[in-house]
């Protein structure tokens, strides 16, 4: 489970108009939510205990022929799916147009409303490596699993780290594995979507691979503030049509960024209106 990041110094300039999001007010947790949350935390701990040896064995077995760590990463993304399926408070679904070939590489981008977005996006049926803040890799067990799965660390504000991360992203794409980036750089703390940064779009143009937009909705209530108990969440990740980059140059980064942001914003607003 990761928190995605973008290289420092790649801020976008797209204007962020005020959006109207759903009411984030969550009623007090009752006995049912307390029991369901306790059960879900137990499931999470059991899954971690099970996944650590499974991933270690998978890594060792596939190491000679899977330099992209596709299989060990694919196994890792299945853990959040199991955790969600056994959490009675959360209902997640994937909609939209899924890629015909999951091994075609994309730069995948999404809006970012909650830490739970990571668990939700893990439901998409293909493997991708996540560009993530380096401090996430320092979390005991979780950070080790991220490293084992081939996710890509980035130290914010460090140009050398940014260059190394972008080189890793290019390597992953050449091995026909997608890269996942939250172009806002961090979670939005309001109903507004932050401006997008340039990094993901520069990467897509340099690698000449399509941008695949995802839209997440409904995760803001999944975690309660200052409470160990979970909230009720009916969340959706929608897969949109890929945006091609053939023939584009680095001079087109800003236009591509703004186009993709507008697509995600429009679809997110439509999803909110449909759920209202």
Language-model segments: residues:
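Non-catalytic C-terminal accessory region of glycerolipid acyltransferases
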Residues: 2-27, 31-35, 163-276
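Membrane-anchoring hydrophobic helices of lipid-metabolizing enzymes
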Residues: 2-106
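Catalytic core of membrane glycerolipid acyltransferases/transacylases, capturing the structured
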Residues: 55-74, 78, 85-87, 102-159
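A generic structural signal for alpha->beta connector loops
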Residues: 89-91, 127, 148, 176, ...
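Generic preference for hydrophobic
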Residues: 94, 108, 130-131, 237-239
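Thr-Gly-centered strand-to-loop micro-motif
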Residues: 95, 131-133, 155-156, 183, ...
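Alpha-helical membrane-embedding segments
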Residues: 95-113, 162-165, 173, 266-267, ...
């Amino acid at each position: 489970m990761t928190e995605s990041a973008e290289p420092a110094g790649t801020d976008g300039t797209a204007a962020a108009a005020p959006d109207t999001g759903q009411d984030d007010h969550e009623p007090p947790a009752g006995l049912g939510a307390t029991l369901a949350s306790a059960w879900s935390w137990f499931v999470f701990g059991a899954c971690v205990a099970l996944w650590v040896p499974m991933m270690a064995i998978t890594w060792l077995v596939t190491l000679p022929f899977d330099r992209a760590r596709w299989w060990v990463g694919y196994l890792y993304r299945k853990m959040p799916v199991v955790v969600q399926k056994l959490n009675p408070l959360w209902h997640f679904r994937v909609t939209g147009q899924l890629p015909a070939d999951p091994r075609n590489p994309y730069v995948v981008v999404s809006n970012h409303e909650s830490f739970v977005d990571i668990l939700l996006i893990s439901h998409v049926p293909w493997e991708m490596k996540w560009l993530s803040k380096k401090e996430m890799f320092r979390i005991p067990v979780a950070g080790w699993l991220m490293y084992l799965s081939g996710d890509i660390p980035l130290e914010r504000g460090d140009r050398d780290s940014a260059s190394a991360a972008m080189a890793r992203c290019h390597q992953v794409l050449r091995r026909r594995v997608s890269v996942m980036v939250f172009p806002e750089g961090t979670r939005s703390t309001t109903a507004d979507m932050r401006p997008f940064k340039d990094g993901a779009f520069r990467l897509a143009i340099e690698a000449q691979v399509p941008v695949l937009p995802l839209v997440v909705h409904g995760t803001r209530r999944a975690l309660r503030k200052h409470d160990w108990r979970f909230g009720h969440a009916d969340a959706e990740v929608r897969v949109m049509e890929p945006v091609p980059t053939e023939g584009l140059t680095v001079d087109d980064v800003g236009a591509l960024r703004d186009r993709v942001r507008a697509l995600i914003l429009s679809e997110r607003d439509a999803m909110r209106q449909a759920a209202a």
